[in-house]
Amino acid sequence: MAFLEVGNHTAVTEFILLGLTDDPVLRVVLFTIILCIYLVTVMGNLSTILLIRVSSQLHHPMYFFLSHLASVDMGLSSSVTPNMLLNFLIERNTISYLGCGIQQSLADFFGSVECFLLAAMAYDRFMAICNPLLYSTKMSTKVCVQLVVGSYIGGFLNASLIMFYFFSFLFCGPNRVDHFFCDFAPLVELSCSDVSVSVIVISFSAGSVTMITVFVIAVSYSYILITILKMHSIEGRHKAFSTCTSHLTAVTLYYGTITFIYVMPKSSFSTDQNKVVSVFYMVMIPMLNPLIYSLRNNEIKGAIKRQLGKKMSC
């Protein structure tokens, strides 16, 4: 039952997710592609976490943050991908009112935590390159744990705010969500409550997370660039640049898609374009991050070779 009588209103008890396409052939193709991407995402990020745990050479701050980033990437992808895959297999994909709120909150939680972790990683690179003599003190285990815990708390607070407002909305009319997951924007359009205040508050909260983390990243890399340009050694410059390249690539991909989805005016792109970019943000990026950090990082490549060597010798 999709509707329930509540007082003088008919409340929605479930939503219909319209997904990416109605074409049956394209649904099969997309199911196969996205399933493969999801499996690579899980295996790639799990491998990153395990490699960092078993390799003593990787037991320092940058890889501590990277292991948590891998966990968050798995969480972000898993919050929407399994349900999206189900959408391809059945004609009418429904999600309960409670399930919709939980899915939306999980996606926002992991998305927010990723922003904070990327900022923490930028700060770590700043300390390593600009203040190498103080690095071990300023980036102690205690400080790293505090930064990671702070990232999770920040993500929890942002997601809790969105969950609070979602469950305060009254949905009494159409229940067809033109998306492949319960995103806040299309749900607001379906609400028959006054959403003006909630939209302002949530926009401010999400905008604050984005602006604060972008500011930290921008300032960190500004100082890093100044420090690198002052280096006289070409080898030193190359080494400093190489330690930042992977993180800069991940930051560019992540914030580039966030900007397209949440910052650009809705009139400038269609709903279908928004869906495609959302797939890249929530499905592709979690798969790409382990590849970005492993292919461009000599320490990780060295750790992989050592672990494979140990396995071969057994």
Swiss-Prot record:
Please list every transmembrane segment annotated in the UniProt record, as residue ranges. Answer: 29-49, 58-78, 103-123, 137-157, 200-220, 241-261, 275-295
Record carries keyword Cell division: no
Molecular function terms, GO-annotated: G protein-coupled receptor activity; olfactory receptor activity
Concerning PROSITE patterns, the annotation shows: G_PROTEIN_RECEP_F1_1 (PS00237), G_PROTEIN_RECEP_F1_2 (PS50262)
Sequence ranges on the Cytoplasmic membrane side? 50-57, 124-136, 221-240, 296-314
Question: What keywords would UniProt list here?
Answer: Cell membrane, Disulfide bond, G-protein coupled receptor, Glycoprotein, Membrane, Olfaction, Receptor, Sensory transduction, Transducer, Transmembrane, Transmembrane helix
Q: Which cysteines are joined by disulfide bonds?
A: 100-192
A Gene Ontology biological process in which this protein takes part is: sensory perception of smell
> At the top level of its lineage, which domain of life is listed?
Eukaryota
User: How is this protein positioned relative to the membrane?
Assistant: Multi-pass membrane protein
Q: Which residues lie on this side of the membrane: Extracellular?
A: 1-28, 79-102, 158-199, 262-274
Please list the residues annotated as glycosylated: 8
- InterPro entries with a match to the protein in the record: GPCR_Rhodpsn, GPCR_Rhodpsn_7TM, Olfact_rcpt
SUPFAM superfamilies (alphabetical): Family A G protein-coupled receptor-like
PANTHER family membership: OLFACTORY RECEPTOR (PTHR48018)
Give the protein's function.
Answer: Potential odorant receptor.
Q: What is this protein called?
A: Olfactory receptor 5P72
Q: Which organism is it from?
A: Mus musculus (Mouse)
